[in-house]
Amino acid sequence: MVKMLVLYYSAYGYMEQMAKAAAEGAREGGAEVTLKRVPELVPEEVAKASHYKIDQEVPIATPGELADYDAIIIGTATRYGMMASQMKNFLDQTGGLWAKGALINKVGSVMVSTATQHGGAELALISTQWQMQHHGMIIVPLSYAYREQMGNDVVRGGAPYGMTTTADGDGSRQPSAQELDGARFQGRRVAEITAKLHG
């Protein structure tokens, strides 16, 4: 059975919802899934004042454990067109894994959230994939296999590189049913492709 980690950073809970949906999809695809998050770097008093969702019950990951999985889906908030510093800080601690080649031929995939439709989602998806490629990971994107991302009648999440959601910091827009469905699709797709590669 494929062992998968869904690893995320979420300040306001939007990516937490997407990560849980991706984990559901991966389980539907036959994977044994672990859901974890990266540590918060913002001081607690600042996080509270900024209305961060600080009651997330999902356990915190350690960089060394990434080698324990066949596949890793990373979900991160986007800051100025890049992954959030919390996720970057976590991934920057994986140099020891890189030196050992511990993630070579593992499967990787990425999802992101932004506060606006033009908030740099595709840049964040691709730059996060770069980190995975430096580790020798095999990238499985959302791709246009997920057809529900097509059309512009409403705000739709998704890009060929990975699933996206647009959610306002004030909570007025949460991940939509279509965006959560896309996260489930991506999780299932990664599980099924990983099973073919590692099964």
Curated annotation (Swiss-Prot):
Residues 158-181 are annotated as: Disordered. It catalyses: a quinone + NADH + H(+) = a quinol + NAD(+); a quinone + NADPH + H(+) = a quinol + NADP(+). Its cofactor is FMN. Residues 4-190 form the Flavodoxin-like domain. Residues 163-177 have a biased composition (Polar residues). GO terms for molecular function: flavin adenine dinucleotide binding; FMN binding; NAD binding; NADH:ubiquinone reductase (non-electrogenic) activity; NADP binding; NADPH dehydrogenase (quinone) activity. Substrate binds at residue 98. It is an enzyme of class 1 (oxidoreductase). The keyword Oxidoreductase applies. It comes from the Bacteria. Its EC number is 1.6.5.2. Keywords: Flavoprotein, FMN, NAD, NADP, Nucleotide-binding, Oxidoreductase. The keyword Nucleotide-binding applies. InterPro entries: Flavodoxin/NO_synth, Flavoprotein-like_sf, Flavoprotein_WrbA-like, FMN_Rdtase-like_dom, NQO. Binds 1 FMN per monomer. NAD(+) binds at residue 12. PANTHER family: FLAVODOXIN-RELATED PROTEIN WRBA-RELATED, FLAVOPROTEIN-LIKE PROTEIN YCP4-RELATED. This is NAD(P)H dehydrogenase (quinone). It comes from Brucella abortus (strain 2308).
